[in-house]
Amino acid sequence: MKSSLQTFDQKIAAIAEHNQVPALSCAVQHKGEIIYSKAFGKYGGFNSNPVEPETSLFRIASIAKSITGLALGRMIDKKMLSLDESIFEYLPQYPKNNFDISIKHLATHTSGIRSYKGKELFSNKSYGIEEGLALFKNDSLLFVPGADYYYSSYNYVLLSAVMQIAAKESFGSFVQREVLDALKMSQTFEEAAKTSLSKEMKKRTVKMYSKTKNGFKRASRVNNGYKIAAGGYLSTATDIIKLGQAALDQSILESSTWDEVLTQQFVMAKPTYYGLGWQCNQELDDMGYIGHIGQGVGAYTNLFVYPDAELVVALLINASVPNLQTALDSAYEVLRKEIPQ
């Protein structure tokens, strides 16, 4: 194990130290114990302190969908809603587009709702969840719900609107109690609530960057408040490990609900590699992984869980650098194949 960790560290360090990222934080857990925890780079701006895996807060992007998936699972277990229910049971005023849309369609990205267009991804307007629906609710669907798969964060904006009506409380407060507190994820916070955090917490939030042909520049300010369920959280690498470990332990949800969350959907006999808020690749050298890749303004993130090896990897970068995924996969491969199962 020692040699594989050294090789893994060398690969991650090469990515971080060759000016390919402004800052990077990574943690690895094996059989319930942290075996690697390291960060590279500095906070940025006027803060020249080095980042740390236990305390530095990064934007987690779409890993937030995995948190939402567990919150949805909690609601299923509490019989607050069911996957096959129509969203119009909760949002009768939402435009019908001549088609019914189920809660499951939203959670599995099979609703036909479009993705971002124009500068929507970079919007810094302060929307609430229901206000955010106005961005896309009157647009035509790309296909009949259930007929195809199309990944869109707007599915999770609409899903969160339904969930908070079913819960009779705000989406954020339900998630905080039922998921974050339950998993002891004490270092995970709503990004939109950052203004209410202490000065110390703000200091622990890394600056976000965008990559240009001349290097990195500070990313545009964006407001992710309305898409909290899709990509609106800040967290640390070690806290995200707890999210992955929950999938291994099958904690906080009933077994049958975990099966729903972690089972990929099929559309027209084709795999989508997506469950309920969790990406599921079950065709990787007989050693499937579950988790999520996240990409957003000032963020690129990985949560990879390898159940057969009882291995969880969390990696957070403060810039959108999807071109590095192949190099990251190469590093994970070292652990995946060499750590004893």
Indicate where each model-derived feature is located.
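Short, conserved catalytic-motif segment at the N-terminal edge
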Residues: 2-58, 80-82
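Active-site SXXK
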Residues: 12, 26, 32, 56-84, ...
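Short clusters of small/polar residues that mark proteolytic maturation junctions
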Residues: 39-41, 203, 301, 317
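A short acidic/small-residue loop/turn micro-motif
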Residues: 41-45, 224, 320-322
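Short, surface-exposed loop or secondary-structure junction motifs
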Residues: 44, 98-295
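Short, glycine/proline-biased beta-turn/loop segments that scaffold the active-site neighborhood
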Residues: 82-97, 182-183
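Short, gly/Ser/Thr-rich active-site loops of penicillin-recognizing serine hydrolases
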Residues: 270, 283-285, 320-341
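Short, well-ordered beta-strand elements
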Residues: 301-319
